[in-house]
């Protein structure tokens, strides 16, 4: 008889959970892409994913997380920790965030475009995105603290991590508001350059 805590059983259970989570995400995004976010109700997503509404709620207590959440935060933190020692914090964050967003764009451009459009057009999605980036900010702050010899709750560390994530959010919104026509990678670099220098002053006559 297989024990409850058998590693094989636990592994199978975890893979099943991951498959269910992925199916719910795909269903929600398909409905949102075709009909808009308001049409992506819990009941409709459940039917599309072939699960019960209670299963959808169990995996995603906040509906917008179906659209917004992924498993990338841990990977992003690991990338930041792997950057060369002594590298400027802004350049470290530039490298890892541009790499992560570029990889997402290459892997599934339509998914990233959908997220960006709904963030720009749907206040509830935009608000939830702001909330979910708080955990990303905490992870990045921990890594920055370790790299700079500061405490994770150091004001400068928290402000810096939050500023970078806020700037990147504005870059994605800017991209979406202009029809997703511009080169996103170039916009990300432009955004982080602006964070370093501020907006250029007008030329004096």
Task: Go through each PLM region and give its residues.
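Short amphipathic alpha-helical segment with a characteristic S/N-K-E followed by hydrophobic residues
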Residues: 24, 62-67
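C-terminal peripheral helix-coil segments that are non-catalytic and often amphipathic
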Residues: 1-7, 180-205
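Residue-level detection of the helix-turn-helix DNA-binding "recognition helix"
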Residues: 47, 61-62
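Hydrophobic/aromatic-rich alpha-helical bundle segments in the mid-to-C-terminal region
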Residues: 130, 146-193
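Short hydrophobic/aromatic patch on the recognition helix
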Residues: 51-60
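Short secondary-structure transition hinges
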Residues: 74, 110-138
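Hydrophobic alpha-helical connector segments
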Residues: 77-115
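Basic, helix-initiating cap at the start of DNA-binding domains
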Residues: 1-39, 43-51, 78
């Amino acid at each position: 008889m297989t024990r409850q805590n058998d590693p094989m059983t636990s592994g199978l259970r975890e893979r099943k959970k991951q498959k269910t989570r992925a199916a719910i995400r795909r269903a929600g995004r398909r409905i949102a892409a075709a009909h808009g976010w308001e049409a992506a109700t819990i009941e409709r997503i459940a039917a599309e994913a072939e699960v019960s509404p209670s299963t959808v709620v169990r995996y995603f207590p906040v509906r917008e997380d179906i659209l917004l959440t992924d498993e990338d935060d841990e990977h992003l933190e690991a990338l930041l920790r792997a950057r060369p020692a002594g590298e400027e914090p802004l350049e470290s964050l530039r490298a890892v965030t541009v790499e992560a967003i570029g990889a997402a764009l290459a892997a599934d451009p339509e998914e990233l475009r959908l997220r960006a459009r709904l963030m720009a057009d749907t206040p509830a999605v935009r608000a939830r995105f702001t909330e979910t980036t708080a955990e990303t900010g905490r992870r990045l702050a921990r890594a920055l603290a370790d790299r700079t010899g500061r405490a994770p709750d150091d004001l400068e560390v928290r402000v810096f991590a939050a500023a970078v994530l806020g700037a990147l959010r504005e870059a994605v919104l800017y991209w979406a508001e202009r029809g997703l026509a511009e080169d996103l990678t170039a916009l990300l670099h432009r955004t982080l350059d602006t964070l370093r220098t501020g907006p250029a002053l007008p030329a004096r006559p």
